[in-house]
Amino acid sequence: LWTPEHSISNEELVAAYNAYAEKYNAEHAGEIESGELTEKPLSSAEFVAKASGIHSRFAYCKDGILDIDRMRPRIPERSDNELSHQAEMALNAARIALKEANKDPGEIDAVIVSCAYTQRSYPAIAIEVQNELGIEGFGFDMLVACSAATFALQRAYEMISAGTAKCVLAINPELTSPQ
């Protein structure tokens, strides 16, 4: 498990959201008054925790998330010739997994990268991971929405059970942060 260095507490998130909501409501006071728009409600850290069970979340890129004029991360574009952000995350996780499993990249028969979405369709993140680590087996990406990690684990289990692989590296490099 690799965890990004940035975290955002409910208090930070709610402070940014409430500032955004107050600004929105002030800028659209006339439309809200006439019923054309609905007022943005304020929130609390307690509500977020009760509704989601989340007290803090990790973010790959914190910049922009708490900016009330943006409210989403600023993830710099990378060219197709550069390692993708998701591949960078996957490599961080892969290196930790290999070390904890006492495995060398040469022992990996397959790399499965499974997530809700990918930043780009080519090259596959699994291929980027293979190239960076020197893995000679096969690899592919799976896009399976919210349950992506469990689908990757199931596919890895099936490969090992069928004898088509002895060692599978399954990675779930999500860029999104819920709530």
Where does each model-flagged region fall?
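Acyl-thioester C-C bond-transforming condensing/cleaving domain
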Residues: E36-E39, S79, R95, K99-G106, ...
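Short glycine-rich or small-residue beta-strand-to-loop segments that form or flank ligand, phosphate
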Residues: D109-A116
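Conserved "HGTGT" condensation-loop signature of ketosynthase/thiolase-family condensing enzymes
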Residues: L1-E107, L133
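Proline- and acidic/polar-enriched loop/turn elements at helix boundaries
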Residues: C61, A110, F140-M142
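Short acidic/histidine-centered micro-motifs embedded in hydrophobic/aromatic stretches
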Residues: A51, S114, I171
